[in-house]
Amino acid sequence: MSFGNTTETDILNLIMLGTALPWAAATELDIHLHTASPGEGGASTVNEATYTGYAVVTVNRSSTDWTVTGNQAVNDNLIQFVVCSGGSNVITHASITPEGSTQIIAYSALGSPLTVESGVQVQFGAGTLTLTLD
């Protein structure tokens, strides 16, 4: 996953200036789906999925939802979106934002595009959503 530009600036301000992350107090994260890259300078609303029934999934920022080992964070639980009830999208990217915000913390292309149409439920199994710092 790549960091969004605003998040990169936030992290540099934290490291170099001691400025707290604006979203440091957020206890939850939102997972978004996209039909194309939202881009490093983009917001989570850029190219966001539009199929009927789509809604972001909110997960906790906690050790019960994520395992951090070395330079990687991995989801510990199933992340499951609502079943598509109409329309269709080809999902190519996912992003993570602070809950209720459009600021992209990180985003990435999926391993392969996923066609979502009526009856399809997008999900990330435990251990399949990985954020790596390098």
Label the model's feature ranges.
Residues 1-94, 98-134:
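Small cysteine-rich, disulfide-bonded extracellular modules of the LU/uPAR three-finger superfamily
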